[in-house]
Amino acid sequence: MQKPSIPKGMRDFSPVEMSRRNYIFDTIREVYELFGFNQIETPTMEMLSTLMGKYGEEGDRLLFKVLNSGDVLADFCAEELAEKNSLRFAAKACEKGLRYDLTVPFARYVVMHRNEINFPFKRYQIQPVWRADRPQKGRYREFYQCDGDVIGSDSLMNEVELIQIISEVFRRLGIRTRILLNNRKILSGIAEVVDEADRLTDITVAIDKLDKIGLDKVNDELRTKGFGEEAIERLRPFIEMKGDNREKLDRLKSALASSETGLKGIEELTYILDKVERVQLHSELMVDISLARGLSYYTGAILEVKALDAEMGSITGGGRYDNLTGIFGLEGMSGVGISFGADRIYDVMMQLDLFPAEKLTGTQLLFVNFSEEDADSLLPLIQKLREQGLRTELYPEPAKIKKQMSYANAANIPYVALVGENERAAGQVNLKNMLTGEQQMLPADAATIVAAIV
């Protein structure tokens, strides 16, 4: 018999792993809702026409396509089958696909429901996405995204709120972080003043690698793309820019004085910094001119978050976009959003041992089952304990005490209650702390037992 297996790049999660993951998801959800965001969900499957062409050629290749129901081959003529063209086959045989991210489905949702939505629309979404990528360490075919967006508003106060959300989420999770901040308009201004305005993408792709490969290799990459030494020298002051946030912005204001676009980006960053300084931010906030993520669709602020105490790439990212819904015919709908990388956050918390033990406990109290009669007498008490929020189990059948204690140990249940004939007659519960081995006799009263455990 063939051993059961799961597809590569997919994962099972144990109860302990799910407790940890839900701790992250619940924290993100609670903070989003504190700031007035409302949750939506979109279907696992979208029409391929919704997904195709939105992620570039590489993204289209990584879409999981779903075969149509029924006898698919009956729709093909002999010549089409003989052609053995997988792309044409998929185009005709597959009308649906698994969502690649949460952004395009969100844009589709806004366009379809625009007459019902109250703008500005503050939405969050925590759902899995799928990519037909080559599985490797830290890269999966199924993973969760935790997105938050404000759409239908040009106000930079939305960026300020999203920065506060990021700071509060990581404060609650116990992760020290640095939020890197830049603006697409500043990058455009830099390209203008070095006389390479039409080569913005080449410039930003190279300088975005600065922290990974260093300045010399960034310059080498620029040379391989055809940049002359004069242009590289003009870029150097921007790439090497040091100082605190205000000093960087002052230098940029001088260096980009001839670029209206660049000055607009500086104005926007200055506004964000001014507002953020009025609140107590728990994360560091650093202007980083080399940050150039998502330039294919971000039009204003760009941000990325790094953990300070763990070796890990970006654990959150986001930015402002001006025309997300334009791909579905609704023009001019500005928005800004962020996405928490749940899997990377999980890995950071494991590295730093940040998951609180008390949050990861399943059952808090196990009642030993001595007999059917004893079990019957315990049911009302167990019901009251559950009503008071104590996660309580009754071992399902009478068994040897050793077996029931072993079950409690294996399940990391911190307390066990023993109520035999003597305890039942006295109206008491023998409560055992499984970590210390200490035992105490308590009245068989739900409030008293809860107080002793919690």
From Swiss-Prot:
Keywords: Aminoacyl-tRNA synthetase, ATP-binding, Cytoplasm, Ligase, Nucleotide-binding, Protein biosynthesis. It is an enzyme of class 6 (ligase). GO terms for cellular component: cytoplasm. Its main location: cytoplasm. It catalyses: tRNA(His) + L-histidine + ATP = L-histidyl-tRNA(His) + AMP + diphosphate + H(+). Its EC number is 6.1.1.21. Belongs to the class-II aminoacyl-tRNA synthetase family. Homodimer. This is Histidine--tRNA ligase. The lineage of its organism: Bacteria, Pseudomonadati, Bacteroidota, Bacteroidia, Bacteroidales.
